[in-house]
Amino acid sequence: MFKAQIRPGVELRLLEERHAAAAYALMDGDRDYLRQWLAFVDKTRSEEDWRKFVRASLEQFAATEGFTAGIWEGQQFIGVIGTRKIDWLNGKVELGYWIGRAFQGRGIMTDACRAVVDYAFRELRLHRVEIQCAAGNARSAAIPQRLGFTLEGTRREAELVNGKFYDLLLFSMLKREWPRMNTNEHE
């Protein structure tokens, strides 16, 4: 997968160390916005921190435990999407994502999620994809809803961000549900 066009001019590319400067600049520019939802933002203080994250992501990829891809519009880095915790025994994976504030509201992340979910079911042959997001993050929650995921429930105070516990919404999609959902436009 690790260069996949998701719409004209927008593609996913496996995150590499050479992307650290662009990724850090985007995250740092949106730090105040992103830090309310993502615990890693306050711990990521430099390009070197990003390089460490990328190295760990590449190790995860090499071990077939997940991947992290940058989202690119032309030559501009605009966000991140990835899988983690691939559970091969039970055929499931968790999907996570974030996009720069200036690129929100255009359906790019929905298209990116659609591509990764399709990859998880068709290429990795997994049975289940999960998405978790903060209950108060309406933009993030709208993505799995648009893609036809089922809201399974709320994990109460399941994530600590900035010294505050947040409830997480848990969404899931099963492989047998995906072909039906993937045939419709959800934008």
Residue spans of the language-model regions?
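Conserved GNAT-fold acetyl-CoA-binding loop/helix
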Residues: 35-55
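Short loop/turn motifs at secondary-structure junctions and domain boundaries
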Residues: 59-64, 149
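Short, polar/charged, Gly/Pro-enriched helix-capping and turn/loop motifs at alpha-helix termini
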Residues: 37, 41, 64-68, 127
